[in-house]
Amino acid sequence: MKEEKSEKESKLKKRILQIIGTITVVCVLMITAGCGIMGMGSKSWIEKQVSDIEKVYPTENPEDLFEKFPIGFTIYQSRIIEENGKTYSIRLEMKGNKDIKKIEGEVKKVLLESKPYKETIVKESKVEYIKDKGLVLENPELVNELLPKNYFLFQKLKLNKDILKKLEVKEKGFSFETGRYNIKYLITNEEIDNYLGLNKEKVSFDINGEYSEIDKTYFHTIIIGKNTEIDFSEKVVEEEIDKENEE
């Protein structure tokens, strides 16, 4: 009797495993089919997501961003530099305040150490964008160290879907879990050369973003680097409506 009961339990377990296996296969097929239908993660799908980058690139007068993003925005920049055998990050963060129509923030020079990893702020200053003057430091004596350029790259760099389609794609990626996507191009561009002090060099040019069916706020980061190194990044983020309502 015990052997018969054990045999029945064994058959039942096998049957359950078969059912689970069948369900798993069906789910995988459904997900694969769904991805094929939607094209999520494909080159054309990602390029469609980043096509609204022309909303910012170019914006010759940063104050025009208040018309594009009425509830405000934040601009981030990061630039990696080498000085006297040491590595520094120049980090700029400025907020577009919709109430006073000013773009203000801070810029810092941060020493990066690897063993152990450590960040030390060595220089910093408040900074403001002023029309016809560009980026202006509260501490002007630090301009050479903190502001390699007194304007944003998006003021000069023109990007749109037609331009991007002509570029060589190096790689692309999409996460179904987070909705984040990126596409990396190879590019030689005069405005990038001028901004980063390059000489007609081909560099990698990443565009990162995040897909959401609900949240359609503007969110793109561009990352420029030589080989695998990240030399510069710039991000413009539209303020979210929910945050505005909470305030």
What spans do the regions from the language model cover?
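Generic short beta-strand segments
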Residues: 75-82, 110, 184-192
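An acidic-aromatic
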Residues: 93-148
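Extended beta-strand-rich segments in extracellular/periplasmic secretory proteins, especially
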Residues: 159-211
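Sec-dependent N-terminal signal peptides of Gram-positive bacterial secreted proteins and lipoproteins
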Residues: 2-4, 12-40
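Flexible, processing/modification-adjacent segments and terminal tails
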Residues: 125-177
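Flexible, membrane-facing loop/turn or short amphipathic-helix motifs
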Residues: 80-85, 115-118, 190-200, 230-231
